[in-house]
From Swiss-Prot:
Residues 159-186 are annotated as: Activation loop. It comes from Oryza sativa subsp. japonica (Rice). It catalyses: L-seryl-[protein] + ATP = O-phospho-L-seryl-[protein] + ADP + H(+); L-threonyl-[protein] + ATP = O-phospho-L-threonyl-[protein] + ADP + H(+). Induction: By drought stress and abscisic acid (ABA). Residues 310-336 form the NAF domain. Interacts with CBL4. PANTHER family: CALCIUM/CALMODULIN-DEPENDENT PROTEIN KINASE KINASE-RELATED, SERINE_THREONINE-PROTEIN KINASE CHK1. InterPro entries: Kinase-like_dom_sf, NAF/FISL_domain, NAF_dom, Prot_kinase_dom, Protein_kinase_ATP_BS, Ser/Thr_kinase_AS. Residues 18-271 form the Protein kinase domain. Involved in the regulatory pathway for the control of intracellular Na(+) and K(+) homeostasis and salt tolerance. Operates in synergy with CBL4 to activate the plasma membrane Na(+)/H(+) antiporter SOS1. CIPK serine-threonine protein kinases interact with CBL proteins. Binding of a CBL protein to the regulatory NAF domain of CIPK protein lead to the activation of the kinase in a calcium-dependent manner. This is CBL-interacting protein kinase 24.
């Protein structure tokens, strides 16, 4: 674990008017932090990027593009970008905070969704993607992990890191990107493709997953997977209605020229059932001049950055952070085992000393064949996925929520979501001796029940 990652558990930070809290997401090139606007009290998500990392990996153009695209797209079903700030060594992207977790977590818990529920999410997805395409924006990495749910259960499309903005005179895209199981066959062929048709294919795979609980194209080795995708070789389970089956087959047409378009999807009888058009305000005038300014090294334009260090013990989680971890303002959602679905950020409670908790996690992780990096009550566990095709990693952090009461937050940072849920259940079983569960459940103690262990 890098020095900054290790120090994160022992410090508090303020960026401009934002009080920066715990890490709530992590990718290859960025971390997402929970933050609070000190002026308004509003909770936000702060995406933090390191300038040197961006330059060393030649990601400058892609990051500029992502920021520009997120400023352009303003839709109720798309995660909103509020502002972008530049520090001496960091770039801070302030985003709408989405508290309902990933859509894929519902699938991981329930197996599949009812047809009416799947249709609602698909309708919202198509509305959002149709809007993006009207702005000349193609997402190119649509998958359930990039589809979030707000506190009211509405869909929010996120992660425009692989998106592209159409240029005049350029008809076909040529960069292969996205997650293999969701990628259209023409994208895999590297012969150029239409971004709109490719996004439609991915939407079809997502609809299938929502209704089936598993992927239409899934193999242990990539050549066989690519062959099935290219041939459009799949079948719908018996519980799909005729209307849904017909629409999915028209979407998962391996020929992009005969594949159904978004306009045709919106006219489909199955799609239109119970459809409620989204109400949008007028498009805002978007100024992209500040995007370039973020990357200019002009010191007097840097946002103020203040860091204070604690005594090296576990971070104390305040009530506001606990509330924002739950759905809406219901604190019981933080630990209630009867939740409708499990968030990717799962957690458990222990009355053991913090050092004992960390030591136990280290021992258990090693028995599970995982490499352990530990510092300042924060641990990163690394391994490989069960199919050996991708890395698997989780981050655990110990928080003090009350005297002699600690919460361990567990987060997936790499790997398949379904595999993560299996890992978490196995971890809880192996750590049974330190996980605390109240014997009697009262209105007060219900707040301290574990999430899924």
């Amino acid at each position: 674990m890098g020095g900054e990652e290790g120090m994160a558990a022992g410090r508090k930070k303020r960026v401009g008017r934002y009080e920066v809290g715990r890490t709530i997401g992590q990718g290859t090139f960025a971390k997402v932090k929970f933050a609070v606007d000190a002026d308004t009290g509003a909770a936000v998500a702060m995406k933090v990027l390191d300038k040197d990392t961006i330059l060393n990996h030649r990601m400058l153009h892609q990051i500029k593009r992502e920021i520009s695209i997120m400023k352009i797209v303003r839709h109720p079903n798309i995660v909103r970008l509020n502002e972008v700030l530049a520090g001496k060594t960091k770039i801070y992207i302030i985003l709408e905070l989405i508290t309902g977790g990933e859509l894929f977590d519902k699938i991981a818990r329930q197996g599949k969704l009812r047809e009416n529920e799947a249709r609602k999410y698909f309708q919202q997805l198509i509305d959002a993607i149709n809007y993006c395409h009207s702005k000349g924006v193609y997402h190119r990495d649509l998958k359930p992990e990039n589809l979030l749910l707000d506190s009211r259960g509405n869909l929010k499309v996120s992660d425009f890191g692989l998106s592209t903005l159409a240029q005049k005179g350029v008809g076909l895209l040529h960069t292969t990107c996205g997650t293999p199981n969701y990628v259209a066959p023409e994208v895999l062929s590297n012969n150029g493709y239409d971004g709109s048709a490719a996004d439609v294919w991915s939407c079809g795979v997502i609809l299938y997953v929502l209704m089936a609980g598993y992927l239409p194209f899934e193999e242990d080795d990539l050549p066989t997977l690519y062959d099935k995708i290219t041939a459009g070789q799949f079948s719908c389970p018996y519980w799909f209605s005729p209307g849904a089956t017909s629409l999915i087959h028209r979407i998962l047409d391996p020929n992009p020229k005969t594949r159904i378009t978004i306009e045709q999807i919106r006219e489909d009888t199955w799609f239109k059932k119970t459809y409620v058009a989204i109400k949008r305000g007028e498009d805002e005038n978007v100024d992209l001049d500040d995007v370039q300014a973020v990357f200019d090294n002009i010191e007097d334009k840097y946002v103020s950055e203040q860091v204070t260090h604690n005594d090296g013990g576990p971070l104390v989680m305040n009530a506001f952070e606990m509330i924002t971890l739950s759905q809406g303002l219901d604190l019981s959602a933080l630990f209630d085992r009867q939740q409708e679905f499990v968030k990717r950020q799962t957690r458990f409670v222990s009355r053991k000393p913090a050092k004992t908790i960390v030591a136990t996690i280290e021992v258990v992780a090693e028995t599970m064949g995982l490499k352990v990096h530990s510092q300042n009550y924060k641990l990163r566990l690394e391994g490989v996925s069960s199919n050996r095709m991708s890395p698997f990693a989780v981050v655990l952090q110990v928080f003090e929520v009350a005297p002699s009461l600690f919460m361990v937050d567990v987060r997936k940072v790499a790997g398949d979501t379904l595999e993560y849920h299996r890992f978490y259940k196995n971890l809880c079983n192996k750590m049974e001796s330190i996980i605390w569960r109240p014997i009697e459940v009262s209105a007060k103690s219900a707040l301290l029940r574990t999430a899924t262990c």
